[in-house]
Amino acid sequence: MESIRELFRICNGPSSSHTVGPKKAAEQFLARHRDAESFRVTLYGSLAATGKGHLTDAAILSVLEPVAPTEMIWKPETVLPFHPNGMLYEALKGGKVEEAWTIFSVGGGALANEHTKQRKPVDIYPLTTIEEILKWCQAEGKTFWEYVEDYEGHDIWEFLSTIWTTMCETIERGLNNEGVLPGGLKVRRKASTYMVKAKSFNDSLSSRSKLYAYALATSEENAAGGIVVTAPTCGSSGVVPAVLYNIAQSREIPTVRILRALATAGLFGNIAKTNASISGAEVGCQGEVGVACAMAAAAACQLFGGTPTQIEYAAEMALEHFLGLTCDPVCGLVQIPCIERNAVAAARALDANLYACLLYTSDAA
């Protein structure tokens, strides 16, 4: 299993599979064909069906168009066998195709084809299921974040510090930005309004309202094409930051503990990515917001003193109640129902944490 560095990525929204992946593919293709006279890019399946709303064409054209004229072709009715997010890049010179390259955006900004990943990450974790890692924790007397540290090395904390700083900056920007989101649905930003109202409520209601505001802040920034952290994807990027920011602010948790919780969240997200999928186009929103909720629940449970068994149970519960959730955004925009779904998932993550902590009293349970 690869590093959590491959899961947490700092990028522009609104979609890791529909913008980050295609842009990365365009950059790789351009590096091989800087002398091309023109380019032709064909989008298939989900990329073509929702690409306009996800700004897929804008991401690709921002790379290729400055070098040579680029034609975009949309084929939503054609789904290539390997994955719904298929792309065909063609470089033309003298009226002839120099290279035709079929590639797929498989979620979280990652690329793959039928044969191999474009840049095969180094597998650093020997265990690839939570069941195995839980047994390791019990045998070693350690918990999940220590498993991450053992195999990632101490420099993982510097990386996670950058990730956490970016998450906080995104929330703070989102809380201050107002107005209508781009795309034509005329969806107004709500994070700042929720935050103002939260300050007038009693402690319990205020805390939950702030949680919603934090999740909305990141999700609205994502919808506007702002900088977010994939956790595990752009479309689900509001859940983990909201939960951690809420706990950090309300309980004055030191940063070092937040980073450890983030490591645990990354581990659980990585497990889902390795054994299943975090691509909404491939497995629906259960693989995006569902996995994000599990990541956040695991992180929260750790911060509240949960044992490895309780942490695992919180993550399991958080994910299983999102099973079957589809990815069917209105007009292909990462706005309805995506934004409010992040807020609901953040609340559900804290509910799963509480439920798990009440159910189990020891790791022997």
Task: Describe each model-derived feature in a short phrase.
Residues Y360-A365:
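Conserved small/polar residues in nucleotide/adenosyl-binding loops
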Residues I10-A25, G225-V243, C285-A292:
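Conserved phosphate/anionic-ligand binding catalytic regions in large, soluble enzymes, centered on
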Residues T264, A272-N342, Y355-L359:
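Hydrophobic alpha-helical bundle architecture
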Residues T70-S200, K210:
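C-terminal regulatory domains involved in ligand/effector binding and gene-expression control
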Residues E169-E252, R257-N270, T274-G280:
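Accessory "access/gating" subregions that flank catalytic or transport cores
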Residues T19-R32, P241-E252, A298-G305:
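Alpha-helical support elements that line or immediately flank enzyme active sites
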Residues L61-M72:
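A glycine-rich helix N-cap at a beta->alpha junction
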Residues E2-N12:
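N-terminal signal-anchor module of multipass membrane proteins
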